[in-house]
């Protein structure tokens, strides 16, 4: 069995920065499981099923990537899936501080390792928050999200065609 890793997140919505991390992870590891957090206590623009569908559209041409939803502690999901490595994208130093705290907690809880990856330079400025903000004003999303995600955002914000 090859090395499987998990790339977890809320992905509300998924964007090209997320896809960049997945593509690069898929070149390094045998299998990448994109784990979409259901997060019922957090306000989300899209429900979990919609976010899974968007990510599936983004990775449909990458054979060693699958997208799953989870609604539990990440380490419990990982145990069920037989995965012991997490991949996380880190854009800024402030991201790293938070991610390091989570990585240390996951290690203490279940002995899982975390691999940090920087997004490629052309995607480092993109966040789901920025994508939602631009989309809410019907702005140009072409360089931020997959066409399917763009379509869903335009529908959500009544932007027309």
Curated annotation (Swiss-Prot):
Task: Tell me what reaction this enzyme catalyses.
Answer: (R)-4'-phosphopantetheine + ATP + H(+) = 3'-dephospho-CoA + diphosphate
InterPro entries named among the record's database cross-references: Cyt_trans-like, PPAT, Rossmann-like_a/b/a_fold
Could you tell me the keywords of this UniProt record?
ATP-binding, Coenzyme A biosynthesis, Cytoplasm, Magnesium, Nucleotide-binding, Nucleotidyltransferase, Transferase
Claim: Lipid biosynthesis is one of the keywords in the record: no
Say if the entry is tagged with keyword Endoplasmic reticulum: no
The protein's matches in NCBIfam families, at most eight in alphabetical order, are given as: coaD_prev_kdtB, cyt_tran_rel
Q: Which protein is depicted?
A: Phosphopantetheine adenylyltransferase
């Amino acid at each position: 069995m090859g090395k499987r890793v998990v790339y977890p997140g809320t992905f509300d919505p998924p964007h090209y920065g997320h896809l960049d991390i997945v593509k690069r992870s898929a070149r390094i590891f045998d299998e990448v499981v994109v784990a979409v957090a259901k997060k019922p206590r957090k306000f989300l623009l899209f429900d979990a099923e919609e976010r899974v569908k968007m990510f599936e559209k983004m990775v449909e041409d990458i054979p060693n990537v699958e997208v799953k939803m989870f609604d539990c502690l990440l380490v419990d999901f990982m145990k069920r899936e037989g995965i012991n490595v997490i991949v996380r994208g880190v854009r800024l130093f402030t991201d790293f501080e938070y991610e390091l705290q989570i990585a240390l907690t996951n290690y203490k809880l279940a002995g899982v390792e975390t691999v940090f990856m920087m997004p490629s330079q052309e995607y480092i400025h993109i966040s789901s928050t920025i994508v939602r903000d631009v989309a809410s004003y019907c702005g140009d999303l072409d360089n931020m999200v997959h066409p399917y995600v763009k379509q869903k955002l335009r529908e959500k914000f009544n932007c027309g065609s």
